[in-house]
From Swiss-Prot:
This protein's name: Glutamate 5-kinase
Biochemical pathway: Amino-acid biosynthesis; L-proline biosynthesis; L-glutamate 5-semialdehyde from L-glutamate: step 1/2
Annotated positions binding ATP: K14, S173, D174
GO molecular function: ATP binding; glutamate 5-kinase activity; RNA binding
Annotated function: Catalyzes the transfer of a phosphate group to glutamate to form L-glutamate 5-phosphate.
Record NCBIfam families: proB
Signal peptide start and end residues: none
Lineage: Bacteria, Pseudomonadati, Pseudomonadota, Alphaproteobacteria, Hyphomicrobiales
Domain PUA: 279-356
InterPro entries, A to Z: AceGlu_kinase-like_sf (IPR036393), Asp/Glu/Uridylate_kinase (IPR001048), G5K_ProB (IPR041739), Glu/AcGlu_kinase (IPR001057), Glu_5kinase (IPR011529), Glu_5kinase/COase_Synthase (IPR005715), Glutamate_5-kinase_CS (IPR019797), PUA (IPR002478)
Catalytic reactions on record: L-glutamate + ATP = L-glutamyl 5-phosphate + ADP
Its EC number(s): 2.7.2.11
Pfam family, one: PUA
Binding residues annotated for substrate, in chain numbering: S54, D141, N153
C-alpha cells in the first residue's frame, strides 16, 4: 500500500516532455501551475522536493519554430539552449507564486559518475534544499554528446535520487504504471500496483512508449527503478496527465510502487565502506573518535596526521592513535590541503588555504563509522 507523500522525507519528481509541452501551443501552463500547487503543499508539510524536468528541447522547438521531424544533433542542442531559458522562467514564475524559490541545475553524465564532480553537484543541490529552494534539474543537452549523456531523464532522475539520498522517486509520464503487457496493444494486460523486485520477467513486460517529444519508454523507467531500488530509494510510476499529479497519488489514482529493500542512507554508506579502496589515511585524536561515534562530521581540528596522495572526493580511512581503522569516508580536501589544515579550527581554514573551503574534512553523510568488531589494525 502506498504511503502518503507527506510521510516521505525527500522526493525526486521526474516530469516527461509530453506532460509539459504541447506540440502546437507550447508550454502547458495550467498543468504546470497545478504541479506547483502540489509541490508547495509538500514543502509546507516538511517534504523536500527536487524536480528533474524534461522539456527543454521540446519547448525550444516551439520557441524556435523548428519542424516536427527528427532533429539533427546541432538543432536539438540549439532547441535545448532556447528551451532551458523558457523552462527555467516558467518554473520560477509558477513556484514564485507560492513564495517558493527555485534554482536550475544542468548536469552531464560525468557530474554523477566522477567523485569530485559528484560531490560538487550534491553540495550545490543540498544548499538549495537548505535554503528552501526547489532544484530544477535537467541534462545539459546543449553540450552533452551521444558518448557522454544519460540519454533520458528517467535514469538521470534515478541517479539524482540516489546521489541525494531521496527515499522516493516519482516518474510522471503519460503511462499510469506497469502492466503485464503494453495495454494499448493487449486488451488482456493486467495492471501491477506493486513490484517487489525488478526481475527479467518484469523487464519483459516493458513496451516501447517513447514519442517524438520524449526519449524514454517503459524500459528506461524500469532501468531507473533498478538504479533507485538498489540504492534504497522507492519508485512510483504514475500518469501525470491529470491536473495535480502528485496529490492524485494521495487520492488513490492508479500508480505502481517499486519498493526498495533498505533505507537510502544505509545503501549509500554501504557503497562507501564496501566498494571503494581508501586512497589515504587520517589519524585522529580521542576527541575526534568520540565525535565520530556520536554521529558528527570529522573536523580538521581533530586530525593529527595525514598519509597518502589523494584527491578531493576520494575515500580515506580514519584511524585512531592506536592505528586501528574506526571509520571511512569521502574527503572534502585533497592531500596537500588536508595537511595544511590538520589540527586547525574550522574558522581558521579560509585564512590558511586562501579560499572558502568546507568546514568538515569528512561530512557525516559521507562517513561510515565501523563497529568495534569491524575495526582492524593498519
Amino acid at each position: 500500500m502506498l504511503k502518503k507523500l507527506k510521510d516521505y522525507r525527500r522526493i525526486v519528481v521526474k516530469i516527461g516532455s509530453a506532460l509539459l509541452v504541447d506540440r502546437a501551443t507550447g508550454l502547458k501552463r495550467k498543468w504546470l501551475e497545478s504541479l506547483g500547487q502540489d509541490i508547495a503543499a509538500l514543502q509546507h508539510a516538511g517534504v523536500e522536493v527536487l524536480v528533474v524536468s524534461s522539456g527543454a528541447i521540446a519547448l525550444g522547438r516551439t520557441v524556435l519554430g523548428l519542424p516536427k521531424k527528427a532533429l539533427k544533433l546541432e538543432e536539438s542542442q540549439a532547441a535545448a539552449a532556447a528551451g532551458q531559458i523558457a523552462l527555467a522562467k516558467a518554473y520560477a514564475d509558477v513556484l514564485g507564486g507560492h513564495g517558493i524559490k527555485s534554482g536550475q541545475i544542468l548536469v552531464t553524465l560525468s557530474d554523477t559518475e566522477e567523485r569530485r564532480r559528484y560531490l560538487n553537484a550534491r553540495a550545490t543541490i543540498e544548499t538549495l534544499l537548505k535554503l528552501k529552494a526547489v532544484p530544477i534539474i535537467n541534462e545539459n543537452d546543449t553540450v552533452a554528446t551521444t558518448e557522454i549523456r544519460y540519454g533520458d531523464n528517467d535514469r538521470l532522475a534515478a541517479r539524482v535520487a540516489t546521489m541525494m539520498g531521496a527515499d522516493l522517486l516519482i516518474l510522471l509520464s503519460d503511462i499510469d504504471g506497469l502492466y503485464t503487457a503494453p495495454p494499448h496493444k493487449n486488451p488482456d494486460a493486467q495492471f501491477l500496483p506493486f513490484v517487489e523486485t525488478i526481475t527479467p520477467q518484469i523487464e519483459a513486460m516493458a513496451g516501447a512508449a517513447a514519442s517524438e517529444l520524449s526519449r524514454g519508454g517503459m524500459k528506461t523507467k524500469l532501468d531507473a527503478g533498478k538504479i533507485a531500488n538498489a540504492a534504497g530509494t522507492a519508485m512510483i510510476i504514475t500518469s501525470g496527465t491529470r491536473f495535480g499529479p502528485l496529490s492524485a497519488i494521495d487520492r488513490g489514482e492508479r500508480a505502481t510502487l517499486f519498493e526498495a529493500a533498505h533505507a537510502p542512507v544505509n545503501a549509500w554508506k554501504t557503497w562507501i565502506s564496501g566498494n571503494l579502496e581508501p586512497a589515504g589515511r587520517l589519524t585522529v585524536d580521542a576527541g575526534a573518535v568520540k565525535a565520530l561515534k556520536s554521529g558528527k562530521s570529522l573536523l580538521p581540528a581533530g586530525v593529527k596526521e595525514v598519509d597518502g596522495d589523494f584527491e578531493r572526493g576520494d575515500t580515506v580511512a580514519v584511524m585512531n592513535e592506536d592505528g586501528r581503522e574506526i571509520a571511512r569516508g569521502l574527503i572534502a580536501y585533497d592531500a596537500a590541503d588536508a595537511r595544511k589544515v590538520a589540527g586547525h579550527k574550522s574558522d581558521e581554514i579560509s585564512a590558511i588555504l586562501g579560499y572558502d573551503a568546507r568546514a568538515a574534512m569528512i561530512h557525516r553523510n559521507d562517513l561510515v563509522v565501523r563497529a568495534a568488531s569491524d575495526a582492524k589494525a593498519a
